[in-house]
Amino acid sequence: MFRRMVVMGLVAVGLVAGGPVAGGVTAWAAESPPRRSEPQGPSPSRSGHLPINGLRLYFEVYGELGKSKTPLLLIPGAFLATDSMKPWVAAFAAKRSVVVFDQQGHGRTADTSRKMSYEQFGDDAAALLRALKVERADVMGYSQGGGVALQLALRHPTLVNKLVSLSATYRKDGWYPAVFKAIEGLNTKMFADSPIERAFRKHTPDAKAFEAYVEKVKVLNINDQNITDAQMRAISAQTMVIVGDADGVKPEHAVAMFKLRGGGNEEAAGTGMLTKVPAARLVILPATSHIGLTGEANVLESMVTPFLDDAPPANPSLW
């Protein structure tokens, strides 16, 4: 169990806080307390594989698409698969339909010789939505998945209604340098008999193929992406930025991202009240790490749902 916690701490997104120490265990992983148990959540109403851009891409749908509220697309982090999003599905699926999928090489989607890139993964997400006949979706991505969500919003703006960025950056320098040192130290031995390795070997038993996959994901996250400020301003989807105050993402980067998306309200600063739905929203959870944020689905659902629903801001009467 401890080794499994260490592996998940190391690779939940391929991004951790703290460099390698003896035995390949990061300082973060060595000190991390056990995560509280999360509900298993609902069963998918539809699941399977679709031919998407040369992949047999695995997806799950919860609820009925095309009814009432805009569906929510969830995009997991690096090395993670649909199973990692169960707490988020459980939090949101009672109020809206939810779609989640495994990226190239992740979970039940086999890897191919195709190069990995955030742009390509964004195109894969767009192709999946179109294959499911979803005209427009709210999109929430975690870490690597947050970067993919940004590319989806940039490259396929008509498909994205609202955008929620969980512990993600739009530029490489938004991460602390220790993050990249930790990624560089990852190797296949750290994944031995982990859920990540077992899922991969169900569809691709070749050990060398798994090693190649790990290296591809490392390269993807080390190279990261560099979206310009102008591109960030041009995104049409209203945006919510969420990080932890002990995240791998620098807090000043999250604030910059928030401001580029129209965040900040001088009128509200002057009156002390918000009179209309803000252009962007920012959440910085206290005492919360990059991995810790994944355990806050219920807390964040109460903040994300009003954003997705355009709920008017509350202005309590003080006198």
Where are these regions (language model features)?
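N-terminal cap/lid segment of alpha/beta-hydrolase-fold proteins
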Residues: 36-56
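Flexible "cap/lid" loop of the alpha/beta hydrolase fold
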Residues: 147-155, 161-197
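Active-site nucleophile elbow and catalytic-triad environment of alpha/beta-hydrolase enzymes
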Residues: 215-231
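Conserved loop-alpha-helix segment in the C-terminal half of the alpha/beta-hydrolase fold
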Residues: 90, 245-281, 285-288, 294
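Short beta-strand/loop motif that positions the catalytic acidic residue
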Residues: 235, 241-243
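Catalytic active-site module of serine/aspartate enzymes centered on a nucleophile-bearing elbow/loop
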Residues: 274-319
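Active-site loop/oxyanion-hole signature of alpha/beta-hydrolase fold enzymes
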Residues: 100-140
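Conserved HGGG/HGGXW glycine-rich cap/lid loop of the alpha/beta-hydrolase fold
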Residues: 55-108
